[in-house]
Swiss-Prot record:
EC number(s) recorded for this UniProt protein: 3.6.5.n1
Binding site for GTP: 17-22, 134-137
HAMAP family: LepA (MF_00071)
Catalysed transformations (reactions): GTP + H2O = GDP + phosphate + H(+)
Keywords recorded for this protein, A-Z: Cell inner membrane, Cell membrane, GTP-binding, Hydrolase, Membrane, Nucleotide-binding, Protein biosynthesis
InterPro entries in the cross-refs: EF-4, EFG_III/V, EFG_V-like, EFTu-like_2, G_TR_CS, LepA_C_sf, LepA_CTD, LepA_IV
Organism in which the protein naturally occurs: Psychrobacter arcticus (strain DSM 17307 / VKM B-2377 / 273-4)
Cell location: Cell inner membrane
Annotated NCBIfam families: lepA, small_GTP
One CC-aspect GO term: plasma membrane
Keyword Membrane among record annotations: yes
Name of the protein in its database record: Elongation factor 4
Family: Belongs to the TRAFAC class translation factor GTPase superfamily. Classic translation factor GTPase family. LepA subfamily.
Tree of life domain: Bacteria
Amino acid sequence: MTALANIRNFSIIAHIDHGKSTLADRFIQMCGALQDREMQAQVLDSMDIERERGITIKAQSVTLYYDHPNGERYQLNFIDTPGHVDFSYEVSRSLAACEGALLVVDAAQGVEAQSVANCYTAVDQGLEVMAVLNKIDLPQVEPERVIQEIEDIIGIDAVDAPRVSAKSGLGVDKLLEALVEFIPAPTGDRDAPLQALIIDSWFDNYLGVVSLVRVRQGTIKKGDKLYIKSTKDAHLVGSIGVFTPKPLDTGILEAGEVGFIIAGIKDIAGAPVGDTITHASTPDVDCIPGFKQITPQVYAGMFPVESTDFEKFREALQKLQINDASLFFEPDTSDALGFGFRCGFLGMLHMEIIQERLEREYDLDLITTAPSVIYEIVKKDGSIIYVDNPSRLPEPNNIEEFREPIARCQILVPQDYLGNVMTLCIERRGVQVDMRFMGRQVQLIFDIPMGEVVMDFFDRLKSVSRGFASLDYNFERYQVDKLVKVDVLINGDKVDALAMIVHETQSRYRGNALVSKMKELIPRQMFDVAIQAAIGSQIIGRSTVKAMRKDVLAKCYGGDVSRKKKLLSKQKAGKKRMKQVGNVEIPQEAFLAVLQVD
């Protein structure tokens, strides 16, 4: 049992690639939690995809015992947070479990928007934030400039910020000493009624749901009966302990500590992230504030290439959902693609990761339609509906108002690229809200339609700023605008999976661009394939994939012209008959062409 005064709960806030997971590895090594032969890069990133992409998706925790030079032994509970904009709710839950945070900044690159957003979240939640300069052994570091940036942009004192190299371990021992001095000890009465926060939950095939919790007050012991506030269910604690990073069964968790609970919960919905746990004997304990149900921001249709894989696909999604409460799916049918699922995601990265995991871990071949956001539609009779699939829109003459979601985007960009970034935001129908100059960086705040942000805004932002701009966004409001649905017809048949919702002013351009892109992607058939873009019954763009044809006149050397005409008309009649019964094969790239229309 560790006294409250000797516990430190902290998190690391960092932008992608600023060295958060590497610094965690050094902490684990220095506190002797793993032997050298067990060490591997990114110890806490347990998924293969996390290691390959170098990103952290799920929150992880590790309890380390640190012997301070003053002779005291401290329990350090480090809670790892995701760094990507799609996973910001998981970050806020991880931070709610801490008293302090280390803001790790790359001493060469400087401050990025994602760190700023997460840092503001930490400050709002009352955490002490300590700046740390990482990668100090690189030749191109500019520590003085970066310290100035941290003070200008985030507003925390960084003059005495420890300078470390997580890769080589330089300065990490001094950082651990500073951390113990700087971050406050947790408070909480160990004899009060139990109140604990669920930081993260995941599913284990043998144990059921494993929940990572932070005990605010009270004590949890093995065999206790727990009560989960939002689901109102009671469960018996089967196993309880801490990660060192390997699970270590301690049989008890007390106020101020972070650890895991296994209580035989069969479904991840039974232990939602951010919820409050108490004892079944004291169900009236107050909830820890900040809990919210996660709502998907981006929707896309996913269909198995082989229709026989449908059940396998359903099982795969159910298994993924067990571990990822933010993934939403419902059955969907498409005239062009058959049976599949409409899936909801937190953002484009989340969607890519889910698709990659389905293909890699479950060996599925999938066709994914272009993603869309949720639109609010006011119908003529005054009723309001929410539509996430363009093919489910009501008829245009039945729509009174079309409202689209607007995202508040915070962009940090060096002054040299300010013009390019502002042009991009305005092209994407953005409205400037604020602009602040902070040292060599500029903070731009724009309101941009969510549909424009989720498409390829992030990639375009990186390319116009040579990778220096960074973005953080969140949903702001719904706003009325003139939007239309553009349908794609192939040989006169609507392909529901290719429909898109665009602004009226861009509809002709986007329709024509999509049609010409499709022409490149659909392979030539034995008959002409007409590709058309239409708004309602009005055709706004067309192109034709020309038929492959055999030279039927090859063996006519001279001779009567009527003989040639007869052969040509016979071929023409055959092609016409083919067109009536022929199916056009549409490759996966064509469905994603909607994304690439600039």
